């Protein structure tokens, strides 16, 4: 289950917990007790039916550095007999998302429009995917009327055609139509599709080329509704309709809770709701939060944002409705079990955009203090901060990190008083701005806002680097020192309060504070032959600085191919393990690290319920113990339609499947989304090889697994006889690798 919805008071205490975790163990225990007491009191109050504090109340200060909120800053203006128009911009023109978004619209129909709350939608469907409701694949507009059927729309289309939902002009036209036909006192705009964080999202099969803007990232991802285009579209929509601003803008999409995204929409909305992580296929609980709005149309956007967060997953129709839940899971499971599994890594937060400028101001001060600190320690905080799924592939470390968790780690790692004070001020400002947030136990360091902090390779690459970042996240870059900090961090140039464009471009040259010069001694073996009864012991020593993670590698020699097949990889546990707010990372003692590992000839296989196939499980997330780690295997997901998509299956350390992610790119890049497997869907494993003659890496399609009624699991198997290559891989804090290998025969 996700963490309970947090009131402003609980969020304030939680941010204080982060700082305590950085500074003092006794204070940490004291604040943990206070947090538990506060949450218990809130739950008891809610159970007794006592109303929540009004949105205009001032929360208890989380730290003495907090600036008191001005009177009336807690909510927007409301009026008697207030009316709403809620606009759903639903781009379902995608194999993965079509059914989920279509059902979201049907969830809204279960509530339907009233005289004070009008619900409208523009939905674009996919050709050849979900076949429900007549399998139409056009773009339609609806005035949403009440209807209980989750699989067929009862509302009549108000317009039909085909539109490029990745075009900002399409969004402007929809908003214009909604305002002209359904004027109201307050407007909410909710956008659904693939999200990508600061680049934006919202792709469409009808889109061609690179779009309206010549930005480097478009050369890789094509025509999307990039963030600067969304900024322009919202400005045009607000200007042409004269609505002043939206009361709330929501992103029912993955990865959009970036401070860069909130900065882009801040001029056009009072409140925003978004997720830091990949959203589950369920999306938002439309029937639940719209029902709250219909029952209380006098609420403001803060209350609506809290309702969206509060109902997320736990009140979704496909969780609480028995028939819909069975259809969604393919099994007879309880609502509690489905909610718990679905919410494990889910996140959602509601933000008061009026308080965002204070966050940006505090972020500037924090960036300045980071610029004066030891950059290698800052890099360590970046690498170990709570991270989220990457759109740039697995070749680079995660670059989307939780801003609050990173600030706490930076204070801890640097031990710098100025950094700590700036982190306190930043967390206090964020505590004021974040109205509500929820996150599952697998994302314990998620606090509601992410930020982009790439490694040196991503920063210097054209598609992910300075040119794309400052062009796409333009409003944020124009009003923040963060991009200037990144330039200083990766070039060694001084950082000042003046926002300037670097000359020459930072891609041309620079430094990598997280990089380390790491060497590995030749591996010594206890024996050259390994059996199930006689394991081998591998020993070596790693020497160097900025060591992040160490991995075990196992490869199998295929004589017919004259190639080495990647068979297994795993984390080597650190000399110690530390945690900040439940996010664990290894600690290595000194620049000289002895490594010893006993290898019993073991590989791993995936069981789909009908067959078992040996598979490479890649280490994904470090945990307190091996059972708490997560692993992944990549392949091609094959839908019933025959369409293939690059995908990643995530397992926990206990052997259970946790999620399946699909990517819009062909190699694990692009927008991720959670796939809800249907019986008969297939997954083709991708095998990774190293050609011994050409010294080149390549992949081939391997065995096929099928989704059915039995949940997938992984389990250990005996390694078959043959020649193996064993080794250790040491990763520095910038994502570079040092390696040492040795051959072993398995009998």
Model regions: which residues?
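N-terminal extension/subdomain marker
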Residues: 66-184
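Gly/Ser/Thr-rich loops at beta-strand to alpha-helix junctions
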Residues: 93-96, 193-199, 250, 254-258
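Terminal, contiguous helix-loop blocks that mediate binding/assembly
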Residues: 72, 76-79, 204-207, 211-747
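Extracytoplasmic/secreted envelope proteins and their assembly/folding machinery
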Residues: 32, 39, 102-105, 109, ...
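Short, solvent-exposed loop/turn and secondary-structure capping segments
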Residues: 99-101, 131-134, 199-204, 261-262, ...
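Ser/Thr-rich, Proline-interspersed low-complexity disordered segments
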Residues: 13, 17, 22-77, 503
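Structural recognition of the beta-strand scaffold that forms the well-ordered cores
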Residues: 85-89, 118-123, 187-191, 247-251, ...
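Bacterial N-terminal signal peptides that target proteins for export
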Residues: 1-9
């Amino acid at each position: 289950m996700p963490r309970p919805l947090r009131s402003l008071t609980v969020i304030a205490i939680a941010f204080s917990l982060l700082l305590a975790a950085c500074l003092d163990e006794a204070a940490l225990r004291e604040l943990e007790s206070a947090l538990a007491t506060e949450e218990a009191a809130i739950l008891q109050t809610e159970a007794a039916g006592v109303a929540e504090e009004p949105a205009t109340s001032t929360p208890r200060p989380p730290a003495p550095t907090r600036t008191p909120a001005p009177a009336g800053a807690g909510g927007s203006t409301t009026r008697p007999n207030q009316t709403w128009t809620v606009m759903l911009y639903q781009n379902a023109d995608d194999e993965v998302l079509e059914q989920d978004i279509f059902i979201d619209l049907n969830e809204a129909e279960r509530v339907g429009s009233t005289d004070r709350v009008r619900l409208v939608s523009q939905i674009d469907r996919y050709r050849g995917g979900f076949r429900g409701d007549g399998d139409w694949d056009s773009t339609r507009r609806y005035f949403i009327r009440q209807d209980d059927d989750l699989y067929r729309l009862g509302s009549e289309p108000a317009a039909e055609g085909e539109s490029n939902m990745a075009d900002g002009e399409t969004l402007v036209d929809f908003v214009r139509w909604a305002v002209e036909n359904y004027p109201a006192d307050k407007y909410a705009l909710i956008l659904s599709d693939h999200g990508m964080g600061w680049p934006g999202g919202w792709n469409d099969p009808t889109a061609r080329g690179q779009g309206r803007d010549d930005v480097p990232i478009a050369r890789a991802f094509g025509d999307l509704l990039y963030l600067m285009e969304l900024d322009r579209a919202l400005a045009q929509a607000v200007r042409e309709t004269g609505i002043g601003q939206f009361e709330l803008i929501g992103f029912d999409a993955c990865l959009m809770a970036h401070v860069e995204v909130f900065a882009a929409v801040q001029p056009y909305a009072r409140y925003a709701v978004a997720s830091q992580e990949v959203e589950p296929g369920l999306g938002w609980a439309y029937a639940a939060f719209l029902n709250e709005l219909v029952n209380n149309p006098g609420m403001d956007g803060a209350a609506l944002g809290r309702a969206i967060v509060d109902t997320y997953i736990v009140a979704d129709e496909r969780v609480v409705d028995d028939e819909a839940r069975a259809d969604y899971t393919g099994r007879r499971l309880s609502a509690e079990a489905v909610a718990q599994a679905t919410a494990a890594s889910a996140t959602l937060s509601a933000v008061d955009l009026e308080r965002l400028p204070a966050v940006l101001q505090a972020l500037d001060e924090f960036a300045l203090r980071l610029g004066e600190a030891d950059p290698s320690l800052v890099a360590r905080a970046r690498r170990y901060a709570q991270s989220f799924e990457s759109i740039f592939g697995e070749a680079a470390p995660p670059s989307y990190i939780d801003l609050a968790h990173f600030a706490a780690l930076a204070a801890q790692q640097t031990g710098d008083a100025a950094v700590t004070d700036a982190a306190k001020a930043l967390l206090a400002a964020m505590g004021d701005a974040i109205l509500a947030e929820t996150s599952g136990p697998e994302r314990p360091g998620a606090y509601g806002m992410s930020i982009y902090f790439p490694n040196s390779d991503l920063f210097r690459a054209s598609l992910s680097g300075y040119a794309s970042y400052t062009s796409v996240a333009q409003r944020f870059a124009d009003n923040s020192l963060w991009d200037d900090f990144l330039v200083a961090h990766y070039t060694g140039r001084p950082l000042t309060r003046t926002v300037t464009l670097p000359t020459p471009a930072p891609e041309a040259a620079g430094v990598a504070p997280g990089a380390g010069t790491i060497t590995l001694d030749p591996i010594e073996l206890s024996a050259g032959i390994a059996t199930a009864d006689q394991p081998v012991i591998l020993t070596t020593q790693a020497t160097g600085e900025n060591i992040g993670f160490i991995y075990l590698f196992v490869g199998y020699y295929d004589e017919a191919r004259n190639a080495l097949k990647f068979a297994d990889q795993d984390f080597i546990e650190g000399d110690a393990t530390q945690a900040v707010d439940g996010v664990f990372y290894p600690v290595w003692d000194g620049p000289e690290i002895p490594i010893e590992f006993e290898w019993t000839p073991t590989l791993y296989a995936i069981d789909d319920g009908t067959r078992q196939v040996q598979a490479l499980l890649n280490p994904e997330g470090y945990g307190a113990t091996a059972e708490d780690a997560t692993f992944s295997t990549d392949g091609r997901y094959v839908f019933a339609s025959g369409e293939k998509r690059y995908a990643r299956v995530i397992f926990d350390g206990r052997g259970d499947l946790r999620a399946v992610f699909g990517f819009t790119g062909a190699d694990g890049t692009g927008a991720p989304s959670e796939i809800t497997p249907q019986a008969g869907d297939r997954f083709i494993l991708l095998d990774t090889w190293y050609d011994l003659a050409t010294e080149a890496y390549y992949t081939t399609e391997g065995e096929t697994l099928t989704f059915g009624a039995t949940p997938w699991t992984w389990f250990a198997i005996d390694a078959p006889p043959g020649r193996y290559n064993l080794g250790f891989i040491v990763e520095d804090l910038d994502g570079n690798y040092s390696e040492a290998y040795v051959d072993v025969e398995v009998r």
